[in-house]
Amino acid sequence: MMKRGVSYNGLDCLADASSDAYMKYKHQLQAEIPWVSQTKYAKYTVYFGIATIFVAFVKQIYYKYRDYTYRSKQSSNFGTSLIDIWISYCRYYGYKQLPTWLTYFSIPGSVGSALYMFLSSLYMLCYCLVPHFWYRGCAGFGSSPLAVRAGLMATALTPFIYVLAGKSNAITLLTGISYEKLNTFHQYTGVACFILSVIHVVPFIYQDLAEGGSSNLKMNFKDSFEYYSGIPPLILLGLLCILSKSYIRKVVYELFLHAHWMMGIAYFGTLIWHINKELGADDYMWGALAFWATQIIYRILMKTAFKPNAMFLRSRQAQLEKLGSDGVYQVVIGNTTGVNWKPGQHCYLRFAGVRILDNHPFSIASVDEEDKTAMKFIIKAQKGLTRKIYQELDKLITSNKNVYVDGPYGGTFRDPRSFERVVLLATGTGVTATLPFLTYLAKTDSIVKRVSFIWIVRLQEDIHWVKSELQECQKLGGSKIDIHIHVAAKKSIYTKGDFEKEIESEETNLNEEDWLIDYGKPSVTSILKLMAGSLAARNMIVCSGSDSLKREVSSIVSELQSLVFNNDLVRSNVEEIYLHTESFGW
């Protein structure tokens, strides 16, 4: 970057702005770096995003093809073996976890996601900053090339921000990655856009101060449209990034939710105003609007009560019932007309008459069957909507409410029937995400040889939340299903003998040997490492629970990948260990 001053080749950047020599230098510098040539920086920013999506799209196609072919013919060849080894190396590093303190800076916990964001940031910063022309000789010669580059790149990121904001979005459709897992990238793209926007602003301020001091800067902010129109979108984008931090969302979630979409609309409108059709940058905004609007319309017509079917604009009746005294209750929706879901998916529920503007995601604890099984949700009262509903139940024990269903969303595009070994691990109400996998595998034909269901609960009476479902799965699945329950609390209202007697009294021919119940807080690391010797060729691990549990499981599964890429050394026949984590149900 050249040294700055108030003159250029003997010309004062302000006093000589109308001279012939000044105009000559202006045309000369514009010819060196034409203003319109900067549009390529926006295009290559979009190309980078499209290339990333394409790689994820190919990955989804391969996995679906591999699952389908393996389900019909359990065999591998040299080509698939090489791919399996390459994938295991990627998972070995990708599943590893970063130190917890880094997540406070909105850095994702997994090494894989963090590495992608680092490389993306490196690409964008180098592409923006490395071209050595940052400024022109005088501000009057034309906008700073650095400012134009950064502004166009920030605008090019806008379509990705709005696409990733949708629960039903085009990127999920193409990649199979659910929106809640893409939310990290939604936040990252917003922060990247904000940083580029700041880089876009700095050269204008710097040159104005260098050439004419604060009075010159003040005059431009007062009289120049390009200056004063850029203030609102920059402030709004900064607020959107700051208020999206996890610690703020946890404290004032409902306030964040409603403020976020309102500021998102305001940001879009003010940015269109600021762009003012310059350099065709508004094309990116209209593209963002097209994706955004399409996604919203699709969600309204296919996922909500506006879906054109028998339940159009109608609520569904739900039965609510307390499950013990620990703030846990269940919601059962009997009428599931028009709603189809897969294991591991969740819905947003909006309760009529109870904070109607609020809705929350809850994992579906039941499976979708031909006889239209009811939707069951197990909810732990936290605060806000869930606490309000529980307080009403505290007086009534059971209650009926009208509820609007928005969903389903989430889950995994992998087919659990295509794995020979499935491990389901959950804590507390996280069982709502793993139980549907157990039920689905118990009731359908598949190549699965063994399903290990591991559930960690605080109290023994918590097992009653899904006791009947577990008994049915054990009866249907027989010896291929192992149910192992860990009761963390040593003291409980029920004794082990009392619970076993209740199981024996059921007409399911179950006894204490069918379910293994241990007492005391277990070591998840030890549980998974002990399973290493009994893994099959293709293995799927589903984990649902607290962030600390998911971090621990991810780290262990990362280590287990060595059974794949070192199978010749350890003499294992393991070809794949796939991990799927769920965030909802807590």
Q: Which role fits each region the language model picked out?
A:
Residues 37-51, 82-301:
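Membrane-embedded alpha-helical bundles of multi-pass integral membrane proteins
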Residues 71-76, 151-152, 180-202, 427-454:
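Classical protein tyrosine phosphatase
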